[in-house]
Amino acid sequence: MTTKLGQANPANYQQQLDDKEKATKEQFSDFWQGDIEVHPSPPSHYRMRAEFKMWQQGAEAFYAMYQPGEYKKPVTLEWEFSVGAEKIVELMPKLLEIVNASELLRKRLFQVEFLTTTTGESVTTLIYHKPLTEEWQAEANALASSLNTHIIGRSKKQKIVLTQDYVEETLTISGTPFTYKQIESGFTQPNAAVCQKMLQWAVDATANLGGDLVELYCGNGNFTLPLSKNFDKVLATEVSKTSVKAAEYNIEKNGCKNITIARMSSEEFTEALNGVREFRRLKDIELDSYNFSTVFVDPPRAGLDEDTEALISRFDNIIYISCNPDTLANNLANLCKTHKVERFALFDQFPYTDHRECGVILTKK
């Protein structure tokens, strides 16, 4: 939907968004006939993270991307990556110039990853097909100073963090700033402007529900923190150790006193809630003490499995954030046997692509 890979096309932005809204209305007409709440993205400079292959020809390296499904045909970037955040656009040519001037930094470099924030903080990861030496580290330190970015070097069984491997992002929801540690290897929402709109939408939608909240797939606490203001207690589950550590840091950093994190999968949580088995990870958590009114899910692209569908259908209120409309439609076919859709939103996380991020509020019939 773009003329070139990685290039924004603001003149066509509204048309592509209208097309997504139309496709969403048609796909979900069996479940929702009302208006879809459409949340647009900035038309350019919206991606806070990006990764590039490094294509090498002779003594020169280039940034390269791939068309979907054509992963053996790299396209070298000879134009500005205008979907990228301003900080990424600023870093890319400066980094390339320094790398190409240094055989030590350039040789066997095969991938570069950028992670940035709305305040201009950044981590830049250089990934190599070679062991990283003290000499490399010395040049990488100079690179970090020159670019004012945190540098990480990665190779097989090697990770060298020169200063830190994370950034701290601040998003403001209902007038309250929330600060998030975003770790270089962890999942974060790539479009900060749209992420903030998603958080605000979820907070507004749950403003009067009360009771306790259970959240599955909580990640680094992205939704957990602002949603905690609307509930008495929050129990959030996450399987990734890295994400759990980040979530615990973010909870403490933001002074949220009513959130408990449990490192377990949705399947394990179902077993615990049903009393099928006991988990040492829950030894300090009294599940019977919770009065769950609402469940929040933001699953991976595969959507919810049957057991998790059955689990969340117990709750009076369901907030479902989906990155895959097809699996959302499949899940709604079952969830709408017990619940009805009250609100439906479309978030344009990835302009100029076919990707559609959706949010649905369901209440028990």
UniProtKB/Swiss-Prot annotation:
Q: What is its EC number?
A: 2.1.1.-, 2.1.1.35
The record's CDD domains line, in alphabetical order, gives:
AdoMet_MTases
Any GO BP annotation: tRNA methylation
**One GO cellular component term:** cytosol
UniProt catalytic activity:
uridine(54) in tRNA + S-adenosyl-L-methionine = 5-methyluridine(54) in tRNA + S-adenosyl-L-homocysteine + H(+); uridine(341) in tmRNA + S-adenosyl-L-methionine = 5-methyluridine(341) in tmRNA + S-adenosyl-L-homocysteine + H(+)
Against PROSITE patterns, the record matches this protein to: SAM_MT_RNA_M5U (PS51687), TRMA_1 (PS01230)
What protein name applies here? tRNA/tmRNA (uracil-C(5))-methyltransferase
Organism field? Saccharophagus degradans (strain 2-40 / ATCC 43961 / DSM 17024)
